[in-house]
Curated annotation (Swiss-Prot):
Protein name stated in the entry: Regulatory protein RecX
Biological process annotations from GO: regulation of DNA repair
An example Gene Ontology CC term for this record: cytoplasm
Originating organism: Streptococcus pyogenes serotype M1
Listed Gene3D superfamilies: Winged helix-like DNA-binding domain superfamily/Winged helix DNA-binding domain
Keywords: Cytoplasm
PANTHER family per record: REGULATORY PROTEIN RECX FAMILY PROTEIN (PTHR33602:SF1)
Function: Modulates RecA activity.
Keyword Membrane: no
Locations listed in the record: Cytoplasm
Amino acid sequence: MKITKIEKKKRLYLIELDNDESLYVTEDTIVRFMLSKDKVLDNDQLEDMKHFAQLSYGKNLALYFLSFQQRSNKQVADYLRKHEIEEHIIADIITQLQEEQWIDDTKLADTYIRQNQLNGDKGPQVLKQKLLQKGIASHDIDPILSQTDFSQLAQKVSQKLFDKYQEKLPPKALKDKITQALLTKGFSYDLAKHSLNHLNFDQDNQEIEDLLDKELDKQYRKLSRKYDGYTLKQKLYQALYRKGYNSDDINCKLRNYL
């Protein structure tokens, strides 16, 4: 086959052959195969050129994708699939990028976990799930997590939650709120409970009573639209008890309130 036309199209070159076939190639392909108009290619040369052209194009796509942030092997492969790069070419590109240290799942996991320690609020269980979603294998994640101390981060997160809710909830409800939030963020139950030891949950009776009054008013406005009489009283009691208030305190308030 003879090349009848070579035309630059933005970042690629359009090559047309005398058998009416056309294809896009990278500049690296032009240089490597010394392509020019009227050059004759046999079938083997043409197949080699096509393979290299897609490899070069796919690698350029991958490097562009990696220029924004670190990515996992799977993320790069998925990106290339979206651009219709063939599977065997993707495998070659991933191998090259690994050899050239553009991608490294272990380093990515380590960086992700370290950044969370500095600026994040996630515990090890959630971190592992997020890394697995990126396609990183457990054997690349688990050793790093096992060597990372999450106690200070748990204390930092619990303190932030304490500051946010201490004027809104009684001690028991506040403890439950912080514990549940830490569990949701991926910290272990033991770590969540241990982090509470660094917080001061002491509230005087007047503070608790003020909180109870405020919550009772709130729940009454909500529930009195649907209920009245004994049913309303029951609903108010249940709502306040779930919030962590003492049963005797609730009953005393309800006697004077209704």
